[in-house]
Structures are given as structure tokens and as C-alpha cells.
From Swiss-Prot:
Localization of this protein: Secreted
One of the record's GO cellular component terms: extracellular region
InterPro entries assigned: PSP94
Domain of life (superkingdom): Eukaryota
Keyword Secreted: yes
Key words, A-Z: Disulfide bond, Secreted, Signal
Signal sequence residues: 1-20
Pfam family, one: PSP94
Recorded family membership: Belongs to the beta-microseminoprotein family.
The name this protein goes by in its record: Beta-microseminoprotein J1
Naturally occurring in which organism (per UniProt): Saguinus oedipus
Length: 114
């Protein structure tokens, strides 16, 4: 029974890690025109097949017809929202969960989702 439970926990962890939040931005294409770059939402240009990280911690890739981006940030769920708060760190793309009254103490988080 413990082996089965352990296997389910490992499986659930991989499903959570692989279920990233992603979106696509279509490139403005003119029929007959070939382009070798993408323009992101901020107006920055990126060469085809290049990758970059946005200020909001999304990992993006420029492709011929679109830009595809996926979040790098796991979001905590299943914690005491009355006692604890989320703090987002853009430098390392992580959210920490700490006590509202004493931010030096971390809170227990039951699950993380992408």
C-alpha cells in the first residue's frame, strides 16, 4: 500500500511540473513576405529560433509563425491564506509563502502548480 501511495505522489508531482501555463503570440505575416524575426509584446525584436526570459518570468521562443511562451513560476496552493502571504521574487522567478505577521517564518504549502 505504501509503495502505491508513494508512486501516486511521484506521478502527481511530475504531472504538476509538466503542466506549465503557456500562451502563443502570432507573428504579423504579410503574404509572400518572409521574416527572420519576431516582435514581442513590448516591441522588442528577436531572431527566429532565439529564446529569452521576460520580466514576468516567462520563457519565450521565437518561431517563424509565432512566439510561444511558458511560465517559469510555480504558484503555491493549499496554504493558510489568512495567516500567510505570497511574495514574488523576479530575480529567481520564485514565489515564497511567509507569515503575514513575521515574514522571516515560512508557511507550509501543500501543493504547487505551474
Amino acid at each position: 500500500m505504501n509503495v502505491l501511495l508513494g508512486g501516486l505522489v511521484i506521478f502527481a508531482t511530475f504531472v504538476t511540473l509538466c503542466n506549465a501555463s503557456c500562451y502563443i503570440i502570432l507573428n504579423d505575416m504579410i503574404p509572400g513576405d518572409s521574416t527572420n524575426e519576431c516582435t514581442d509584446l513590448k516591441g522588442n525584436k528577436h531572431p527566429i529560433n532565439s529564446k529569452w526570459r521576460t520580466d514576468n518570468c516567462d520563457s519565450c521562443t521565437c518561431r517563424e509563425k509565432e512566439i510561444s511562451c511558458c511560465t517559469l513560476v510555480s504558484t503555491p496552493v493549499g496554504y493558510d491564506t489568512h495567516k500567510c502571504q505570497k511574495i514574488f521574487n523576479k530575480e529567481d522567478c520564485r514565489i515564497s509563502v511567509v507569515e503575514k505577521n513575521d515574514p522571516s517564518k515560512t508557511c507550509e504549502v501543500n501543493a504547487w502548480i505551474m
